[in-house]
Amino acid sequence: MKIKLGNKETIHFVGIGGIGMSGLAIIMKGLGFKIQGSDLSFSKNIERLKNNRIKVFLGHKEKNILNSTILVISSAIKKNNPELIKAKKKKLPIYKRGEMLGHIVSLMKNIVVAGSHGKTTTTSLISSIFSFSKIDPTVINGGVLNSYGNSAKLGKSNWCILESDESDGSFLDIPVTYSIVTNIDAEHLDYYKSLDNLKGSFVKFLDKTPSFGKSFICIDDPAIKSISNKIKNKNFLTYGLDRSANFRIENVINNKDYSQFNLSINLPGQKKDYIKKLQLPIIGLHNIRNAAASAAVCYLIGISNSMIKSGLKNFQGVQRRFNNLFSYRNISFIDDYAHHPSEISCVLTSLREVYREKEIVCIFQPHRVSRLNSLKDEFTKCFKHSDYLILCPVFKAGENIKLNFNYKNFAKQIIKNSKVNLVIVNEEKDILKYVKQNIFGDKIVIGMGAGSISNWMRSLEHKLK
């Protein structure tokens, strides 16, 4: 269903403080719509919205939508939300974020980045390459790009680079020109019910690829490999370390300052090509795969090899993705968004590879009880490359669910399976106390999680000093 474009519409975003909702709101404001929204509490995203002259109500109340003509809801909004109930009574058009996003970007040529992990970094890397190519794209990302100071920007070209959200299936509403699927992992099973259903949704997504576009899939990923024969639309190319990849990663170098690799390009009916010594200022094989995907789509679009190299080498990063915060007593403090066992394992493996001589201290805040319940065993095994683990209480993210296991026994299983020294803390101040009393010498301290842990890590600097 198409919406009527025009300045007379007042579009109200319920849950506007989320990273995806705030980004879409900023884009639509730039397109000329009157935008407002509401959320439960103030945040940096709301501060960015206000800087873009978007009105934000704190708290969800019926009166907030008195002048609204359209409602956009985030996937976190419950059926008993007073604004949603009032909108239904008023018979207002109500759209999920993914539906509205699909309507807006249908006016553009889209590069859609999907997958369980690595979407935000991949979207940001493509944006960096475009910027160095003097193409000004619209960008809608799941994280704040350091180069923009925002998660979204309205560009002057007809290109849109966007991160999809598969959590509620609405990523299937987004029109695709080019797409990337980075990997598929056991996430959002509260919605999909099974990994097979999740895989099936990605098959549907890839089958949407038009004849004038192309999809790119990471053939290194076991779940993607398992569905490759089920994709009816064969208009896709592969990337990865696998020898069969159309865009094959070779000669990998990883150190604490940068990553480097070559890209061997083997396309049907075309002469073999190479892009040598691709460098990026972030570490880890997972990020090299993200960079390969970014290079692949830009190469096929027609961006020059030199511009691809420049865009990757000068990448300015994304907030909450392996951010070096500060140093204290020769200890480096890092903030990272990793909150799934696969992500945690990738980040810690990368750290261990480039900092072999240092001890690694991980401060982990589990995000969502539902995720911890469904992936309990995987969480006990993902800290093997950490020497110490500070385990925080679960950040519930609004969930009213109970753990189906004993937390102290869970900690004991982590010690057993990950061979790590572990301490449980009950609140933020306990982290400060433990670090002051126990963390000395040449160490790396990394905070991990998608909740309040990022703010906790940032507040440590002035509290320690």
Where are these regions (language model features)?
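Nucleotide phosphate-binding/pyrophosphate-handling subdomain across enzymes
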Residues: K2-H12, G20, L24-L31, I180, ...
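Phosphate-binding loop of NTP-binding sites
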Residues: K2-L5, F13, G20, I27-F33, ...
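Conserved N-terminal Rossmann-fold NAD(P)-binding element of oxidoreductases
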Residues: I11-I16, M448
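NAD(P)-binding Rossmann-fold cofactor-contacting core
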Residues: F33-R48
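Beta-strand->loop->alpha-helix junctions that form or flank phosphate-binding loops
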Residues: S38-D39, F57-H60, Y95-E99, I140, ...
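Short acidic low-complexity segments
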Residues: K55-N67, D430, V435
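C-terminal helical cap/extension that packs against the catalytic core
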Residues: T380-G441
